[in-house]
Amino acid sequence: MELQEVLHMNGGEGDTSYAKNSFYNLFLIRVKPILEQCIQELLRANLPNINKCIKVADLGCASGPNTLLTVRDIVQSIDKVGQEKKNELERPTIQIFLNDLFQNDFNSVFKSLPSFYRKLEKENGCKIGSCLIGAMPGSFYGRLFPEESMHFLHSCYCLHWLSQVPSGLVTELGISANKGCIYSSKASRPPIQKAYLDQFTKDFTTFLRIHSEELISRGRMLLTWICKEDEFENPNSIDLLEMSINDLVIEGHLEEEKLDSFNVPIYAPSTEEVKCIVEEEGSFEILYLETFKVPYDAGFSIDDDYQGRSHSPVSCDEHARAAHVASVVRSIFEPIVASHFGEAILPDLSHRIAKNAAKVLRSGKGFYDSVIISLAKKPEKADM
């Protein structure tokens, strides 16, 4: 089976779907002020045709109602600028392209569009037709749009996914060089970590080059994804998965060879690695770069606001919170796990993930490290 066929979130609206378990809205709380700033700068820059139609893409949009939260925030940001400038700026038509791989569950997004449009009209006064939303399936590591056609590109929690599993993970004798690990984790040897970094560097460089060609001069990108801070101090979601698969091997439920042949194309870069790649590629200026932490159990409660949460061990509803973490991890990785190990292990694996999540929560290290970077395409000399 091709890698792109299993690199997608769990579709549908069931208990293990990404739509039911994503806490994307909580990440957007943290990202929204920077998103607003990007949109405000775009509209104030008087870029070609932007006052008539602002063209935006959400790269790696995933599925479910949460996919449209970014669209909502963009519309609100545009309205905010319009209110500040009053009659100087008419509301432009907003053309939104939702991008993900071909296997993404776009249908669940489309089903929520009628109610979303009605809500926009009620809350923001957007007439039907002033916000146009469509799909642009395909890999964001390849060309998606015509040259110099886009104003703003957004991507949230996608760029840690690589275009392919790095080479060099198997010896000449066909033996795994990354035994006991499923990606470039803390236990991986330096050559494995370098192989993953090299693949990330290649992919991110390609991403920047291709999308710089699609953006107009001084167009913006806002990117957020998991990063590596404090030398793996805080285990992320794939670390929980790795621990739990190892538990199943130790308990005799899985063969060690099956684990050793499972390599996930994910890399969590350091902020320095991100900065160096952007500067080396050369198409963009870094406007903003910051890291932040999000608790494992963010989104456990409907009223959860992780920004107000202290970084202390969680004891309240520990089992329920750990089960929530396991559901989130499963919604992200189930397709690729089931493809390699089979669906039969999923219930046991979820149980082990919950147990490991509870341990990490008790240790006070239950946080996902994330990086957010705002980029502006450098103008051509003729535009300066």
Swiss-Prot record:
Q: Where does S-adenosyl-L-homocysteine bind?
A: 18, 61, 66, 100-101, 139-140, 156, 158
Its required cofactor(s), as named, are: Mg(2+)
Q: How is it used?
A: Tobacco plants (Nicotiana tabacum cv. Xanthi) expressing CaXMT1, CaMXMT1 and CaDXMT1 accumulate caffeine and become less appetant and toxic for caterpillars cutworms (Spodoptera litura). Caffeine also stimulates endogenous defense mechanisms against other pathogens (e.g. tobacco mosaic virus and Pseudomonas syringae) by triggering the expression of defense-related genes.
Q: Which UniProt keywords apply?
A: Alkaloid metabolism, Magnesium, Metal-binding, Methyltransferase, S-adenosyl-L-methionine, Transferase
Q: Per its UniProt record, what InterPro entries does this chain match?
A: MeTrfase_7, MeTrfase_capping, SAM-dependent_MTases_sf
Q: How is the cofactor bound?
A: Binds 1 Mg(2+) ion per subunit.
The Gene Ontology biological process terms listed for this entry are: alkaloid metabolic process; methylation
Q: In which pathway does it act?
A: Alkaloid biosynthesis
- Which residues does the UniProt site feature Involved in substrate discrimination point to? 154, 266, 328, 343
Any idea which GO molecular function terms this record carries?
A: caffeine synthase activity; metal ion binding
UniProt binding sites for theobromine? 157, 160-161, 237, 368
| Family the entry assigns | Belongs to the methyltransferase superfamily. Type-7 methyltransferase family.
Functional summary from the UniProt entry: Involved in the biosynthesis of caffeine. Catalyzes the conversion of 7-methylxanthine to caffeine, likely via theobromine as an intermediate.
Name of the protein this chain belongs to: 3,7-dimethylxanthine N-methyltransferase 1
Its taxonomic path starts at: Eukaryota, Viridiplantae, Streptophyta, Embryophyta, Tracheophyta
